[in-house]
């Protein structure tokens, strides 16, 4: 059986969500993936991570800092890993796309965004939100929602899905497509 190779030109796209009609192939001083990273750094949702605690239970002590610091650290490690993987892929697939060097930028942008939609206390916070609506004082809201899908978003709250919502939702007075991230960056954020 013949082994198929990945089509990097198809997998890595500079097209932006919500701006498909405005796609241009020629870039200026930054790549489209570096623009994704920059859009995240300067965004309000990213800056709000400074108010969320990140707790690492380590043997003998508990290390506490905020999720903004955590996300910046994760982005640095992710960029290094992505760059190393891209280097190895370029050796294996010498005729592949010129996008391979951009994998580090894509991974670092995904790492920056990985906690955007998560509540304080991570998975415990997700469970608290879900139980507040399904079993607690928030159950009355079900009657006010337009459909079952909205209710399920609350009782099965999931931080990764909320991150994607934050990045793609059109906020009041803003452009269609939310952050208008590249499809490659959005795809890498879906499930880290």
Regions found by a protein language model. Name each.
Residues 57-63:
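Short hinge/gating elements
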Residues 1-29, 41-52, 61, 72, ...:
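Sequence-structural signature of the catalytic-core scaffold of metal-dependent phosphohydrolases
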Residues 30, 65-68:
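Low-complexity, highly charged intrinsically disordered N-terminal segments
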Residues 68, 112-113:
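Alpha-helical architecture
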């Amino acid at each position: 059986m013949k082994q198929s190779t990945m089509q990097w030109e198809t997998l890595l796209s500079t097209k932006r969500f919500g701006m498909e009609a405005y796609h241009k192939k020629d870039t200026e001083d930054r790549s489209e993936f570096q623009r994704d990273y920059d859009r995240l750094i300067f965004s309000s949702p990213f800056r709000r991570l400074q108010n969320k605690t990140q707790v690492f239970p380590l043997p003998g002590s508990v290390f506490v800092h905020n999720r903004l610091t955590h996300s910046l650290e994760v982005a640095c490690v992710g960029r290094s890993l992505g760059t190393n993987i891209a280097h190895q892929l370029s050796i294996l697939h010498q005729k592949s796309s010129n996008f391979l060097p951009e994998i580090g930028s894509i991974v670092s942008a995904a790492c920056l965004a990985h906690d955007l939609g998560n509540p304080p206390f991570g998975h415990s916070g997700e469970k608290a939100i879900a139980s507040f609506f399904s079993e607690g004082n928030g159950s009355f809201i079900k009657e006010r929602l337009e459909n079952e899908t909205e209710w399920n978003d609350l009782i099965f709250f999931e931080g990764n899905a909320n991150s994607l919502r934050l990045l793609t939702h059109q906020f009041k007075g803003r452009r269609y497509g939310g952050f208008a991230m590249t499809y490659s960056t959005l795809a890498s954020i879906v499930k880290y």
